[in-house]
Design a protein with these regions (language model features):
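C-terminal beta-signal and adjacent terminal beta-strands/loops
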Residues: 4, 576-577, 670, 679-688, ...
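Short, acidic, small-residue-rich periplasmic hinge/interaction motif at the N-terminus
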Residues: 22-24, 35-40, 48-53, 82-86, ...
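Outer-membrane beta-barrel translocator/receptor signature
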Residues: 196-198, 211-213, 224-236, 240-296, ...
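Flexible loop and strand-edge segments within Gram-negative outer membrane beta-barrel domains
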Residues: 289-309, 315-376, 382-405, 449
Length: 767
């Protein structure tokens, strides 16, 4: 009781102080002041997220658990408060013109987070528990636990996802969702498909985690709003939004395999006006990695990387029913793999080198009216990439290249709440998009001058009915692609059954397509047998079509002081006119070629399991596992040896079993421990001649990759925290044992964990 009286007394003093300091022209009303505390202990909860459902406005509580909103129009609002380790709470508040509204939130401890707010389900902010499709979320807590510096090292810890390195020289990464390779999935930045085929080559390693607030993943087609080419799923990168006045500095030093070093530094700052009408978040990241040679042949398995990223995200509110958002980031990267790094690329035996200058930005204007039941969003984004490259072997002076890539997208989205649509209340969403990608790739030595202009005009609409126990979402997307004669119609249907807060069941059907165009791996040249291997498109290449089905059961329960959640998901995808790569030998200019052709079809099906169990902050365990089959409908030719066609029905580089786990614990208030790991099952990988005599298909062993990290936080002056951390990645030193060696190696014959045993130490300063 004394604590409650003390809290009330402090708030009264705070209100009086606020009223005394209000400048002329601002009334004492139109303000919400609040306090967030723990339910049982009544301790302050700092850095809780507070979100106004009607306006989309948000902030975070300060070190004392306090927050405020100013200049709110009088009326009713719903405030949703969430914090790591606590249940989400929503309350209705009434804002008056005459006085300040004071509200208190008491959050109950919740060990398994189920109420995170997500936008990837239907482009509207909803609780993950109420989303019509399964949305997996990777947060900053996960990035810290696995000590990931970039997006590529984070995605392995999301069920159904697996990141692989496809080049022994330059380190070309791609993410597979439910076994489907990278081009089947769509990478979004703040819900915009601005990541082009060229930026997809190395893009997963060019996005530092300190620019990311969270990553939302939808497996399968799911929503009609994000593109029919998202056959495998979507990876939506939500960048940091300014919500409070804060800053952070990080530094990390790592040693790969005992003789190769990597240094990285990052900085973040966020500034928000007291009345929350404007704010800006800034981030910067620098990373330098030396090349690593695992087998001592003088050729790198991990290339040299030097990358610098700077960016910002800002907002301005002309009124409390409108918001203007701006974002921009630039990346400068030098990447090189091969040998003789002290010489020019054409003086080495093998070099794959790229220099990227990337500039990307966007603007969004959001407007709400009629009590925010209707919202309109206008948006435009643009990205330009200037790439200078060298993909060559045997001291080839003509293997230099230059690529210019421009991508832009513009559109509008309308969302309206309907009190009664046919049989229940609903939320209707529709919109239009137009996107264009202009690519010009020149490689004089390979006599390649590729120009590609892709234009897609799209319309989408979907309606979501909420019927208490059921939620039904039906949507349609229409895409007119300039490389396809007829418009593509892609319907989507999602059904959510929610008999209780603890149980949700979902069914999903979606369709999609992939256009006959160049994708990320087509813009990369693999060195095999001392020469570069290119990819060309077949003259009669048709679009690839897909039909996808999925179903899931999501159950949360408590037993004693423990809380658990288990998600079981089944999926099935049928692909027609599936794209395959076939070795076609030398072209007229004597260059080795592969051709992208249409196969008969393929089926990918299987099951995901995602389980979590936690006991407060004491200990938390999360396990994800996937069992699947990826098979062509008939055997497809992948190469010929002495006139004999070699075929396979099994999709290459796709294991039938893979998974991950994360185990975190805080035995002391300031001490955090984490043990994490991934499992990769056996798969088939093509091995082309050069180092070996003839092409052959290899069956790989399985791998277990374990990581350990410890972090301790010191409280410095004026709420400044200093964290010191250290650990080891790939404790077991699981790494490919049959690497090709020398200048005639097949650089594409590379699989397994992407780095050897690595020791690291780091510091972080935050306020």
């Amino acid at each position: 009781m004394k604590k409650i009286l003390l809290i009330l007394f402090i708030n009264i003093l705070g209100i009086n102080a606020l009223q005394a300091s209000l400048p002329d022209g601002i009334r004492e009303g139109n303000i919400i002041m609040g306090h967030v505390i723990a339910d049982v202990t009544e301790e302050d909860i700092p850095y809780a997220s507070i979100y106004i459902e009607e306006t989309g406005d948000g902030t975070v509580s300060n070190e004392d658990g306090q927050f405020e909103f100013r200049n709110l129009p009088a009326g009713k609002y719903h405030l949703r408060v969430s914090a790591v380790g606590y249940s989400t709470s929503t309350k209705e508040v009434v804002v008056s013109k005459e006085f300040t509204t004071v509200i208190h939130f008491k959050l109950k401890v919740e060990d398994v987070q189920m109420d995170e707010l997500v936008v990837s389900a239907n482009r509207n902010v909803v609780s993950r528990r109420d989303a019509p499709v399964v949305v997996s979320v990777a947060s900053m807590e996960l990035f810290d636990a696995v000590n990931s510096l970039d997006l590529a090292k984070s995605l392995n810890y999301i069920t159904g996802l697996r990141v692989e390195n496809n080049c022994q020289n330059c380190g070309f990464p791609q993410v597979r969702i439910n076994g489907l390779e990278g081009p089947y999935s769509q990478v979004l930045i703040n819900s915009r498909p601005i990541v082009s085929a060229l930026s997809g080559v190395y893009g997963l390693e060019q996005i530092p985690v300190n620019m990311i607030e969270r990553v939302e993943v939808v497996r399968g087609g799911g929503s009609a709003l994000f593109g029919a080419n998202a056959v495998g799923g979507t990876v939506n990168i939500i960048t940091k939004d300014p919500t409070s006045n804060s800053f952070s500095l990080t530094s990390n030093l790592a040693c790969y395999g005992g003789d190769s070093w990597e240094q990285s530094m990052g900085a973040n700052a966020s500034l928000v006006s007291k009345d929350n009408t404007y704010g800006i978040a800034l981030y910067e990241n620098y990373r330098n990695r030396n090349p690593y040679d695992h087998d001592g042949d003088g050729f790198s398995e991990l290339g040299k990387v030097n990358i610098n990223t700077f960016g910002m995200r800002a907002f301005y509110r002309p009124s409390y029913t409108s918001r203007l958002s701006l974002e921009y980031h630039t990346t400068n990267e030098l990447r090189r793999g091969g040998n003789k790094f002290d010489l020019q690329p054409h003086e080495s035996d093998i070099t794959e080198q790229t220099k990227h200058v990337i500039n990307s930005g966007g603007v969004t204007y959001d407007k709400g009216w009629r009590g925010y039941k209707h919202k309109l969003s206008l948006f435009a984004s643009v990205q330009h990439i200037d790439r200078n490259s060298y993909y060559g072997a045997q001291r080839d002076p003509n293997a230099y290249g230059k690529t210019d890539d421009l991508t832009w997208i513009a559109g509008a989205t309308y969302t309206g709440q309907i009190d009664n649509c046919l049989f229940s209340p609903s939320v209707f969403t529709s919109g239009i998009e137009y996107q264009e990608n202009k690519l010009h790739d020149i490689m004089t030595g390979y006599k390649r001058d590729m120009k590609q202009d892709v234009r897609i005009a799209s319309f989408f609409a979907q309606n979501e009915w909420d019927m208490n126990l059921f939620s039904l979402l039906m949507g349609l997307r229409v895409d007119k692609h300039n490389l396809i004669d007829n418009p593509i119609f892609s319907p989507r249907v999602n059904l959510l059954f929610k008999p209780s807060r603890e149980l949700q069941a979902r069914l999903t059907y979606s369709t999609g397509f992939r256009a006959p165009q160049a994708y990320d791996e087509d813009l990369h040249v693999t060195a095999v047998g001392g020469e570069g291997v290119q990819i060309q498109l077949a003259d009669n290449l048709k679009e690839e079509r897909s039909n996808s089905f999925s179903g899931s059961i999501d159950w949360t329960t408590k037993f004693g002081h423990w809380q658990a959640n288990i998600l079981l998901e089944g999926f099935y995808t049928d692909l027609n006119n599936v794209f395959i790569l076939e070795d076609i030998g030398l072209n007229a200019d004597g260059h080795a070629m592969k051709e992208r052709r249409n196969g008969d079809g393929a089926r990918v099906y299987g099951a995901n399991i995602d389980a979590k169990i936690a006991h407060g902050n004491d200990i938390s365990l999360q396990v994800g596992f996937t069992a699947q089959q990826s098979r062509y409908k008939r055997a497809e030719v992948w190469t010929e040896v002495e006139g004999e066609a070699l075929t396979t029905r099994r999709m290459m580089r796709t294991p039938d079993y893979y998974g991950y786990f994360t185990l975190t614990s805080s035995p002391l208030k300031r001490l955090a421990l984490s043990l994490t790991g991934t499992y990769t099952g056996s798969m088939i990988v093509p091995h082309y001649s050069g180092y070996i005599e003839n092409d052959r298909m290899e069956t790989t062993p399985d791998f277990v990759d374990l990581n350990l990290k410890a972090a301790y936080t010191f409280i410095l002056h004026d709420h400044i925290n200093l964290e010191i951390n250290a650990g080891v990645q790939n404790i077991l030193d699981s790494f490919q044992s049959d690497l090709d060696k020398g200048e005639f190696r097949d650089s594409g014959y590379f699989y397994g964990p992407t780095q050897p045993r690595t020791f690291f130490v780091g510091i972080k300063i935050t306020k």
